[in-house]
Amino acid sequence: MRLENKVALISGGARGMGAVEAKMFVQEGAKVVIGDVLDEDGKQTESEINETGGECVFVHLDVTDETAWQDAVAAAVDRFGKLDILVNNAGIARINNVEDTTSDEWDLVMDINAKGVFLGTKAAIPEMRKAGGGSIVNISSIAGLTGGRTSSYAASKGAVRLLTKSSAIQYAGEGIRCNSVHPGVIETPMTTPMMLNTQEGRDLNASRHPLGRVGQPEDIAYGVLFLASDESSFMTGSELVIDGGLTAQ
């Protein structure tokens, strides 16, 4: 198993990509803590994993709250003894140009998407140090590479990209790796209402990708699994783009 004897904490793990990542991690031998503000969905995912023989704990986690992050890390250590893997998966999207973006919207998106990654990383590093190393996987976006029309979202995901590189350099000597994942358009409960809720929208977004379809959560989860595992032991500060060829055009 690719994650045997590993302990992982996944933010935004109640549904969508985070839930798929959690289930895949457990299938590969990991023990998992999922954190989210969506308590009902989180408890459902926890039950689904445990009913199949996996080991999963759900904790309420507001990623903008430093104390909540400390509590989530403590939950992983208290239940499973250590922390090896952090997946900063939680995020939101707002699609507005600069003039239509309010200060409140900017602050909300930056707090969840960028500050949340910072706080998660900060909370996880001391326990990874005790464990002798670890892997941090930050979910950015192709919007963090190319910009586009999503002002606050692109800025937040660009921040994730460079925070990843900064963290990678700072902690490489302690065996703590940090890499970012940059998805294209992925069919999730977050993106579907905004982009994929009509056949026209689905066709348009599928056509943007040279492979001719939008991505599925599993497409991203397999990449996250690789970065979380020891198979990627010589990768840190890197960008894993999983976008159906969109940014190659």
Regions of interest found by a model, annotated:
Residues 97-98, 102-107, 201, 205:
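Substrate-binding pocket helix/loop in short-chain dehydrogenase/reductase
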Residues 3-33:
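Canonical Rossmann dinucleotide-binding motif of NAD(H)/NADP(H)-dependent dehydrogenases/reductases
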Residues 224-225, 236-249:
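Short C-terminal tail/terminal secondary-structure segment
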Residues 173, 185-209:
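A glycine/serine/threonine-rich, flexible loop-to-helix segment
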Residues 121, 156, 164:
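Active-site helix of classical SDR
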Residues 141:
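Residue(s) in the substrate-gating loop at a strand-loop-helix junction
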Residues 126, 169-173, 233:
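Alpha-helical segment proximal to the catalytic Tyr-Lys
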